[in-house]
Amino acid sequence: MRYLKFFLLLVFLVPSFGFSMHIMEGFLPPTHALIWYILSLPFFVIGLFTIRKTIKEKPNLKMLLAFVGAFTFVLSAMKIPSVTGSCSHPTGIGLGAIIFGPFTMTVIGTIVLLFQALLLAHGGLTTLGANTFSMAIVGSLVSYFIYKSLYKKNRNIAVFLAAFLGDLFTYVTTSFQLAVAFPDKTHGFIFSLAKFLSIFAITQVPLAIIEGLVTVVVIDLIYKYNKNELFEEGL
C-alpha cells in the first residue's frame, strides 16, 4: 500500500526524547492503578471481538489495521520537551478511531502503549490501565463521536476536530487521573487538576493542532489510494 511510504517517513523523523507524558511506572498508588485496569477491561474485551469480526468479514482490511497501529505507535512516540520541564506528545489515536471506531482502537492503543512501555520505557506496566483509559478509550471515544457528528457537513473539518479534541481530552483525562491520585494537600482536587492541566497546556494545544492537520492529510491519502477500504468502513 502506498501509504506505507508515509509511515516509513515518519519512522525516520521520530525524535528520541527520553521523557513521556504517559504516567510512568510505579507513579500511581496501587489501588488507583488497579481501578483503571478494571475500568479499561470491558472496552478491551469488546474491542477484541470487534477486531475478530472485522478481520473475518473483511480480511482485506488487515493491512489498514496494521497501518493504523503503526501510525499510532510512531506519532505517540514523539516526545516533545515542555518549557515546564515535563513532556508532551501527540496521541495518534484519532485516525484509527475515525476509521475503525473506539473499541478497535482500545485494543490497538493498548498494544501500542504496552510496546512503548517495554521497548521505549514510556509509561509502564502498572500504569498501563490508566494510560489505556486516557488515550485509547477516552481519546478514541471523543474522536469517533466528533467525527460522526460532523463528517456529513465537512469531512476535513470533522477529521481535524476529531483528532484535535481526541488529543486534548486524552490529556484532560490524564490530568484528572493524576489529580485524583494526588490532590493538593491545602486546596484539594480542583487546584491539583488545574495545576496538572496547566503543565501540559503550553505544548499540548499546538501539538493537538499539528495532529489534527496530519490526520487530515493521512485520511486524504488513504482516500486517494485506497478509497474502497474506507467505503467498507462507512467513511
Swiss-Prot record:
Membrane topology label: Multi-pass membrane protein
Name used for this protein in its record: Cobalt transport protein CbiM
The keyword Transport is annotated on this UniProt entry: yes
Quaternary data: Forms an energy-coupling factor (ECF) transporter complex composed of an ATP-binding protein (A component, CbiO), a transmembrane protein (T component, CbiQ) and 2 possible substrate-capture proteins (S components, CbiM and CbiN) of unknown stoichimetry.
Family label: Belongs to the CbiM family.
Stored Gene3D superfamilies: 1.10.1760.20
Lineage: Bacteria, Thermotogati, Thermotogota, Thermotogae, Thermotogales
Membrane-traversing stretches: 34-51, 63-83, 95-115, 118-138, 156-176, 199-219
